[in-house]
């Protein structure tokens, strides 16, 4: 369904990702993980055709993404972007109905079936009661669920989700991952960016670890989420252990490193005099 071959990606003349190769099959939920700035969102935008490839190749459902027309692309893959700034008074219903645009001719407005699909998606993500509320007046979590409903309304076989759990509370974070797993069980393919490593370990069939502009690891969660790989990628001590209650993998950091230096900086910020320092 998704294939990248020796892909180089970036923007503004800067190379962010180098020589990235992987494939995602039908029905898989694959998580892109790694530190901030590693290139996860850049990779997703490149695969979606938002950013141009610097070199290499990328395929979507067997076709080169460079030759796909906009509507054809939109019928194959929906994209949930990381941040959406909205100042106009578009309501949740307006936003979700926009997910139906790949199926509309320029002269055709939404019909009853489009509205029914949009409302079903809003009900599924728990925002139907917000249908007439402007998006810019909503909380971050409400807005994220509206945007997820829009992606669903697009009814595509492939979903690119950039941090779909951002801004959500613990219950909805897990619900998003459960929902993605249900989609994949129905045959859809999901490639998502995740910072919630413990949830990614539970719900993703595979993980791609991005770090230092490269694909550092590709495999099952237990193969990728190791102390050594995560410490290398994040540049700080990371530990992976089994939760004795849930028996799921949990990821921890060792915060002690650098605490002494941070304490000195905090004393400056708070105006706390150091020992031996005279006024």
What feature does the model see in each segment?
Residues 233-279:
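ABC ATPase nucleotide-binding domains
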Residues 33-35:
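The feature captures the beta-strand-to-loop junction immediately N-terminal to the Walker
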Residues 134-138:
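Conserved ABC ATPase signature
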Residues 48:
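Helix-to-loop junction immediately C-terminal to a conserved catalytic motif
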Residues 56-64, 73:
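Conserved ABC transporter NBD signature motif
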Residues 159-162:
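Catalytic Walker B motif of ABC-type/P-loop ATPase nucleotide-binding domains
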């Amino acid at each position: 369904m998704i294939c990248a071959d020796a892909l180089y990606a970036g923007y503004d003349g800067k190379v962010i990702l180098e020589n990235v190769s992987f494939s995602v099959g039908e029905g898989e939920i694959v998580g892109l993980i790694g530190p901030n700035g590693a290139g996860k969102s850049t990779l997703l935008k490149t695969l979606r055709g938002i950013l141009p490839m610097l070199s290499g190749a990328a395929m979507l459902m067997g076709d080169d993404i460079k030759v796909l027309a906009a509507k054809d692309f939109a019928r194959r893959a929906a994209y949930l972007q990381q941040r959406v700034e909205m100042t106009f008074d578009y309501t949740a219903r307006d936003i979700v109905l926009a997910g139906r645009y790949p199926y509309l001719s320029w002269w055709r407005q939404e019909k009853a079936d489009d509205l029914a699909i949009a409302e079903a998606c809003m009900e599924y993500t728990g925002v139907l009661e917000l249908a007439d509320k402007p998006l810019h007046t909503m909380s971050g979590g409400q807005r994220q669920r509206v945007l997820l409903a829009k992606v669903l309304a697009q009814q595509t076989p492939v979903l690119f989700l950039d941090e779909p759990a951002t801004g959500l509370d613990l219950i909805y974070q897990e619900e998003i991952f459960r929902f993605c797993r249900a989609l994949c069980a129905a045959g859809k393919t999901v490639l998502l960016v995740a910072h919630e490593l413990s949830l990614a370990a539970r719900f993703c069939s595979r993980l791609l670890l991005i770090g230092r502009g490269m694909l550092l690891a590709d495999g099952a969660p237990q193969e990728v989420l190791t102390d050594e790989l995560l410490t290398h990628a994040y540049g700080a001590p990371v530990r992976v252990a089994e939760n004795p209650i849930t028996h799921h993998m949990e990821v921890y950091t060792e915060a002690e490193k650098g605490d002494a230096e941070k304490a000195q900086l905090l004393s400056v910020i708070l105006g706390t005099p150091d020992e031996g320092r005279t006024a």
